[in-house]
Amino acid sequence: HIDSQNYYEDTVSFSLAFAQFNSQDICIYRSDWNRLEAFNLTTNQLLTERYIAAYKTEPPKHYLDYFHGALYVSPNNDYILDDGWIWHPVASPKVWSLSQWIKHNPFESEDGSSVQTLCYRENWNAVMCWLDDQHVAIWNIELWDQEEFDLKPEPKNRSGIHLLSLAK
């Protein structure tokens, strides 16, 4: 039974993707608005077992203030692309390493060293895809003013297709 709970779950596509890891079939799914799991379909085992304390007055360690969206696995099964958003609301697609998540750090999808925010934009649920193992295309990205944390004013703001590389 897969359930993403009921906190603004209608604002994003249901987070679900399949990948291959060590020649085994993996299901990646959202178990809460800000939490993803990886489940081995071959061995029937949860691969990302972890505990995150409840939010009280301060966010606990590994707390993620991020709504997971549609998931896209890279062609070589090395990365996961997540079309999620943060409060403002602002779209904030991210990528992270599947092998880092499963082999080394069950908190990788929250705040691991491989997590990269690709851009900020006004709208989420955008069309995006992997072009190859290291490059992502995202349609309709408005130009973003990082200092103002808002869209750049017209006429400078041109939407279009943006090609983004994972190379650091």
Predicted feature locations:
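Short beta-strand elements that form the blades of beta-propeller/WD-repeat-like
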Residues: H1, S23-S31, L36-E37, N77-W85, ...
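Long, mid-chain structured domain cores
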Residues: H1-Y55
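Surface-exposed loop and turn segments in beta-propeller and other repeat-based domains
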Residues: I2-E9, R50-Y66, K103-E122
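Structural signature of eukaryotic scaffold interfaces centered on beta-propeller domains
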Residues: Y7-S23, F67-D78, R121-D133
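Structural motif
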Residues: W33-F39, H88-W96, D145-H162
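Short loop/turn segments immediately following beta-strands, especially the blade-tip
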Residues: N44, S97-F107
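Loop/turn-rich, solvent-exposed surfaces of beta-rich toroidal or solenoidal domains
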Residues: W124-K168
